[in-house]
């Protein structure tokens, strides 16, 4: 096994954003962002969450404090970097993954890489707003490089999740578009075949907005020999922005992990 880097290394802190450290936490919850997203939204979860959890939000290259870095070329490059950053903080504590949309796929590939290289698995993976990676119903990602700025604006308004005042601010939109294009390119290249057997042994939970157009979240069950369940919450693709839904997710995750630790 490769030697883990120091838990306080700049590399680790660059990739993982932990705004609210909790040394007494029993579990570490690693959160993965949606396409075009940063780490701040999920890092803030750590302020109001069960005391048994410490939240670390993944910060991808090309945004926030990593603004000057080039974007990743594919999802495996992203996962490899995350695994390197994770190793120092998951050696002594149980951990789980939560990903929304694009982040669900990053969480999956990160889990598979951890298992392949280090024989480690999260206790649980929580996926949100994402079709199974091998599903024929997985939405086709538009080639954003072929869209005008105005077309991207309309696409974001239709999709939801990005505040309208930000989308209508031309300067903000021009900063955001490169992030979205980079992540959309990664998703577009991500091809995942249906496995002939379970790849993981952990439990998977799916969350979905009642008005989301995402289909076949149930297909995630094909990836694990563990249990699988789905929870539908009111809202669209970004249903988790609603405080009630966010609280439900955080409380559910805490209960799941506490029960997992007893088995």
Swiss-Prot record:
Catalytic activity: (9Z)-octadecenoyl-[ACP] + H2O = (9Z)-octadecenoate + holo-[ACP] + H(+); decanoyl-CoA + H2O = decanoate + CoA + H(+); dodecanoyl-CoA + H2O = dodecanoate + CoA + H(+); tetradecanoyl-CoA + H2O = tetradecanoate + CoA + H(+)
InterPro entries: AB_hydrolase_fold, TEII, Thioesterase
Documented effect of changing residue 262 to A: Strongly decreased thioesterase activity with FASN-bound fatty acids. No effect on thioesterase activity with free decanoyl coenzyme A
Enzyme Commission (EC) number: 3.1.2.14
Single GO term (MF): fatty acyl-[ACP] hydrolase activity
Record key words, sorted: Acetylation, Cytoplasm, Fatty acid biosynthesis, Fatty acid metabolism, Hydrolase, Lipid biosynthesis, Lipid metabolism
Active-site residues from the entry: 101, 237
Annotated disulfide bonds: none
Gene3D superfamilies in the cross-refs: alpha/beta hydrolase
Modification N-acetylmethionine, positions: 1
Superkingdom as given in the UniProt entry: Eukaryota
Family of the protein in this entry: Belongs to the thioesterase family.
Function: Contributes to the release of free fatty acids from fatty acid synthase (FASN). Has broad substrate specificity, giving rise to a range of free fatty acids with chain lengths between 10 and 16 carbon atoms (C10 - C16).
Record-given protein name: S-acyl fatty acid synthase thioesterase, medium chain
Annotated source species: Rattus norvegicus (Rat)
């Amino acid at each position: 096994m490769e030697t883990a880097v120091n838990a306080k290394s700049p590399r680790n802190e660059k990739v993982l954003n932990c705004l609210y450290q909790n040394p007494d936490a029993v579990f570490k919850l690693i959160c993965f962002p949606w396409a075009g997203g940063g780490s701040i939204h999920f890092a803030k979860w750590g302020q109001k969450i069960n005391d048994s959890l410490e939240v670390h939000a993944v910060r991808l290259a090309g945004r926030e404090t990593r603004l000057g870095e080039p974007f990743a070329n594919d999802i495996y490059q992203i996962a490899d970097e995350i695994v390197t950053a994770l190793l120092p903080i998951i050696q002594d504590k149980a951990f789980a993954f939560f990903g929304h949309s694009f982040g669900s796929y990053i969480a999956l590939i990160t889990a598979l890489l951890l298992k392949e290289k280090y024989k480690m698995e999260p206790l649980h993976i929580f996926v949100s707003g994402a079709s199974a990676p091998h599903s024929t119903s997985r939405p086709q990602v538009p080639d954003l490089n072929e869209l005008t700025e105005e077309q991207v604006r309309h696409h974001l308004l239709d999709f939801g999740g990005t505040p309208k005042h930000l989308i209508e601010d031309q300067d903000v939109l021009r900063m955001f578009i490169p992030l979205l294009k980079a992540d959309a390119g990664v998703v577009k290249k991500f091809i995942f075949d249906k496995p002939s057997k379970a790849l993981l042994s952990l439990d998977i939970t799916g969350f979905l907005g009642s008005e989301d157009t995402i289909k076949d979240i149930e297909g995630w069950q094909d990836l694990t020999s563990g249990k699988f369940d789905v929870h539908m919450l009111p809202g669209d693709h970004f249903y988790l922005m609603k405080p009630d839904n966010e609280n439900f997710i955080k409380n559910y995750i805490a209960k799941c992990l506490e029960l997992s630790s007893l088995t």
